[in-house]
Design a protein with these regions (language model features):
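Bacterial N-terminal signal peptides
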Residues: 1-3
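Acidic, Ser/Thr/Pro-rich low-complexity intrinsically disordered segments
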Residues: 9, 15-68, 91, 105, ...
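Aromatic sugar-binding surface patches on proteins
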Residues: 76-85
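Short, surface-exposed loop/turn segments at beta-strand-coil junctions that are enriched for proline
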Residues: 88-94
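Extracellular recognition modules
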Residues: 99-103
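Edge beta-strands of extracellular beta-sandwich domains
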Residues: 109-117
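Extracellular carbohydrate-recognition regions
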Residues: 121-137
Length: 180
């Protein structure tokens, strides 16, 4: 009796996962400024480059690291690694949604949208504004770039309007990857 034996390389060897982006903080960056952006996601170790769909934006990787999962949030939603990026937006850039792609050693991420500029002046959420007595004054119209620091955080804003004036308040958080 004879036996035939075939040896082959394991064709099912799993390739490393490419980078995946969960969110960028802040969700928006201002025209004509340099802003530090934290890109959170998975498999972001070893990343040395990000690309923008807009040539008026330059992106410089400052560091990559493990990311703590914020209290009460799920790592499957917010990621476990992060990239600190310096984003510089030229003054002549028009407000728009811009796609960022993470270029990693194991492939490229899917594009992630970040807001660039606004048709309204943008201000940052300033603490302490956690109650009506500490409400942060804002103008109308105004775009506010806010951050929820923990699961019980509330941000309160105060503004003046006429009796008959109607307001449209739009929150972009969820559609741009925020854990809010």
């Amino acid at each position: 009796p004879s036996v035939a034996l075939t040896l082959a390389d394991d064709a099912t060897e799993k390739k490393p996962d490419p980078p995946r982006v969960a969110m960028c903080l802040p969700l928006a960056i201002n025209v004509g400024e340099t802003t530090k952006v934290i890109v959170r996601g998975w498999h972001l170790e070893g990343v040395k480059e990000l690309r923008s769909s807009n040539s008026h934006i330059t992106l410089k990787v400052l560091s990559t690291s493990k990311a703590e999962v914020p209290n009460g949030l799920d790592v499957k939603r917010v990621g476990d690694t992060q990239i600190e990026v310096e984003a510089t937006v030229a003054r002549d850039t028009k407000p728009s949604e811009v796609e960022l792609t993470v270029i990693g050693p194991d492939g490229d991420s899917q594009p992630h949208v970040i807001l660039v500029g606004s048709e309204y002046p943008v201000i940052a959420d300033k603490e302490a504004n956690d109650g009506f007595r500490q409400a942060q004054p804002v103008a109308v119209p105004q775009a506010i770039d806010g951050v929820i620091h923990d699961k019980r955080n509330v941000d309160v804003f105060a503004f003046d309007i006429d009796d008959e004036q109607r307001l449209l308040i739009e929150v972009h958080a969820r559609r741009h990857g925020s854990a809010l």
